[in-house]
Amino acid sequence: MAFSRTHSLLARAGSTSTYKRVWRYWYPLMTRGLGNDEIVFINWAYEEDPPMDLPLEASDEPNRAHINLYHRTATQVDLGGKQVLEVSCGHGGGASYLTRTLHPASYTGLDLNQAGIKLCKKRHRLPGLDFVRGDAENLPFDDESFDVVLNVEASHCYPHFRRFLAEVVRVLRPGGYFPYADLRPNNEIAAWEADLAATPLRQLSQRQINAEVLRGIGNNSQKSRDLVDRHLPAFLRFAGREFIGVQGTQLSRYLEGGELSYRMYCFTKD
């Protein structure tokens, strides 16, 4: 779910309504192209040194590199017995994996992409797991409804990031947690940090994970390239490779050169 050159162009144009419309159409387009039972993760990959070597079911093994990012982000806190909301759940692979392995009391995946939610409901049928369509900047839940709000590689798509953060604060219970991972170009880092610091949430941890994401992309690159080439028409393959994370793309080079910063955070609501 990484941003492409569209992100920079729209940011310079300064039109949040245009920005939101582009993402509103882009993700359903990718779901129609990539949306089948084989492609349940659309986040970039992640691997540590030494490798994480998570014990996975055979059906999860093809998605190990994507699961690593979800696992490392989510396990900054204990999800066991918690009511969890994932904002921007994509194709639901992370929601399914975390529900099956970390045993939350309930797990709700929310996404603006109606086609993606339809795919999630069809593909991931588990006790305690639900999917709803909704806007990250206007969450359809009561105040203090969740113990954990998770967000993985998505908030760069939100035209009003502070509104999203305000919604996280609103729906989190006191003592709740916000494990979070995303990326920004260097010229947006100061604003990103300022927005995060302006919330009443208390930061527990923060680290840059460029090296781990690049390692994961490298390990997973051929698989991702093959998926794009197999499922997308030729005119969308360039954008598809940037979107899903393939070694040698412009965005991976920016990540390697330090022009992008990919970070993992954890916050709590006191």
Curated annotation (Swiss-Prot):
Xref: Gene3D superfamilies: Vaccinia Virus protein VP39
Other information: Was identified as a high-confidence drug target.
Organism placement in taxonomy: Bacteria, Bacillati, Actinomycetota, Actinomycetes, Mycobacteriales
Enzyme class: transferase
Protein name: Phthiotriol/phenolphthiotriol dimycocerosates methyltransferase
Any one GO molecular-function label of the UniProt entry: methyltransferase activity
Top-rank taxon: Bacteria
UniProt family annotation: Belongs to the methyltransferase superfamily. Phthiotriol/phenolphthiotriol dimycocerosates methyltransferase family.
SUPFAM superfamilies per the UniProt record, alphabetical: S-adenosyl-L-methionine-dependent methyltransferases
Protein EC: 2.1.1.-
GO biological process, one term: lipid metabolic process
Function per UniProt: Catalyzes the methylation of the lipid moiety of the intermediate compounds phthiotriol and glycosylated phenolphthiotriol dimycoserosates to form phthiocerol dimycocerosates (DIM A) and glycosylated phenolphthiocerol dimycocerosates (PGL).
Organism encoding this protein: Mycobacterium tuberculosis (strain ATCC 25618 / H37Rv)
Alphabetized InterPro entries for the sequence: Methyltransf_11, Methyltransf_Superfamily, PthPhpthDimycoMt, SAM-dependent_MTases_sf
A cellular component term, taken from the record's GO annotations: plasma membrane
Keywords associated with the record: Lipid biosynthesis, Lipid metabolism, Methyltransferase, Transferase
